Amino acid sequence: MSIKSDKWIRRMAQEHGMIEPFVERQVRGEGADRVISFGVSSYGYDVRCADEFKVFTNINSATVDPKNFDEKSFVDIKSDVCIIPPNSFALARTVEYFRIPRNVLTICLGKSTYARCGIIVNVTPLEPEWEGHVTLEFSNTTTLPAKIYANEGVAQMLFLESDEECEVSYKDRGGKYQGQRGVTLPRT
């Protein structure tokens, strides 16, 4: 597998709709305002977080069960910022909608700006022929509230191209998160 460059990412986004909306350069500021960078980088794409958040709460004293997840465990927030309570987490989604080629696996890594503040981003790999908005999980590992900014960079996608296509893709399997839009909770 080889990692793909900015030229390949740009071509796949523009000719095949791999990333929509697509920002073909790295944005570090908007006017006089500084932002956490997003858009194409040398060997990746820095995604933005949309303004839809689900913040974990324990007001119902529920047990977290991935096979029977209770939606009431979250408070929905639509805002330019999200405050995550200490030692808690929030879900969000990317602004970008992805269409992953059949011979590509995409890995997501958190941005150092957030990591250096104790905020960890977790996303499982985007499998061959998966498409949708990426659901992002932000863990606040600190003892203080932590802030996430909507419409700014939160993570980087790395695209790894295989030397041969897989026999069965995510789409072929009928993956349960295929075509997801918005913030998507656990499914079984």
UniProtKB/Swiss-Prot annotation:
Keywords: Hydrolase, Nucleotide metabolism, Nucleotide-binding. It holds the Pfam family DCD. Pathway: Pyrimidine metabolism; dUMP biosynthesis; dUMP from dCTP (dUTP route): step 1/2. Its EC number is 3.5.4.13. It is an enzyme of class 3 (hydrolase). DCTP binds at K111, S112, T113, Y114, A115, R116, T135, L136, E137, Q156, Y170, Q180. One of its GO terms (biological process) is dUTP biosynthetic process. GO terms for molecular function: dCTP deaminase activity; nucleotide binding. It comes from the Bacteria. The active site is at E137 (proton donor/acceptor). It catalyses: dCTP + H2O + H(+) = dUTP + NH4(+). Disulfide bonds: none annotated. Coiled coil: none annotated. Belongs to the dCTP deaminase family. Homotrimer. Catalyzes the deamination of dCTP to dUTP. This is dCTP deaminase. The gene is dcd.
